[in-house]
Amino acid sequence: MPELRRDPVVGRWVIISTERSRRPSDFASAPVLPRNSGPCTFCPGQESRTPGEVLAVRIPGSAPNGPGWDLRVVPNKFPALRIEGELEPAGEGVYDRMNGIGAHEVIIETPDHGASLASLPETQVVAVLEAWRQRMLDLQKDARFEYVSVFKNHGEAAGASLEHPHSQLIATPIVPMMVEQELEGALRHFRMRKRCIWCDIIRQEMQGRARGLGRLILGEGGFVALCPYAPRFPFETWILPEGHRSSYEDALGTDRRALARVLGEVLRRMNQVLGAPAWNLSLHSAPLKTPTLDHFHWHLEIIPKLTQVAGFEWGTGFFINPTPPEEAARYLRAGVPTAT
């Protein structure tokens, strides 16, 4: 029997279509493999092909914007928003507009063209996580910006135009609608119960694990990875700090090391179970001007590209998920592919 489930944060309903239930081996897609060995725009020796770096982790003595780096952050050569100028908001009847002001940056995660977050050493993943944090803290100083979205597209099917390992961030003068919905839903829960909804979710999932019923994948070093109760997509996974933290920027050094371990392990298990799929990652953190909130809890969302969003989803807002999260979590806990 199919089941309708309601997301406890934003109130979105999804259809868990058990009659279409699919195992990992049913999601036939080409694994994400290097298409070429480089050199590409992001490879060492090609630094002149990118805008000047705004942050870099370098070998001592190496010159900026040249070889000798472990990580670089550069403005996007083809930005979605421009950093120069003022917002100048205006209206025309019911229509609102403002200038397309923002920041769009690329985090080049490693010199190794053929690597991935799943294969990088923990220390390098920590460097990536710290680069996200440093850039968020710097962009927070710009009074025009309300939010910084950090995201990663892994694989062509996930929207990656270049295969060299990289993530991106976009600072916007508006808090994104999806984050606004999370903020509003979390505030409703907090006003009723005086508790953070994500803290309650973590608590309930950890209790479920003790009974062998949960959607928890793993927990380590103060972080948990879980498949949410009402996932939009098969094998959708969240990573959250166990303790209440509303802003990613507040993450301590020990937090980033633990997060690097959990993130790397989740991605490796997805590769094992799902055959190295394409995926999207997004960071949800508190808005820049309200970094400390009792009702919001920062988290990562990882969505493997296993199904297509089609007419019903676009027309209704309902998502049809053929894999119950309990099954997805069970496969990811085992971390081994299921035979056909």
Residue positions per predicted region:
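Active-site microenvironments that recognize anionic phosphate/pyrophosphate groups
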Residues: 1-164, 170-246, 254, 267-272, ...
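Gly/Ser/Thr-rich active-site loops/lids in small-molecule metabolic enzymes
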Residues: 249, 253-262
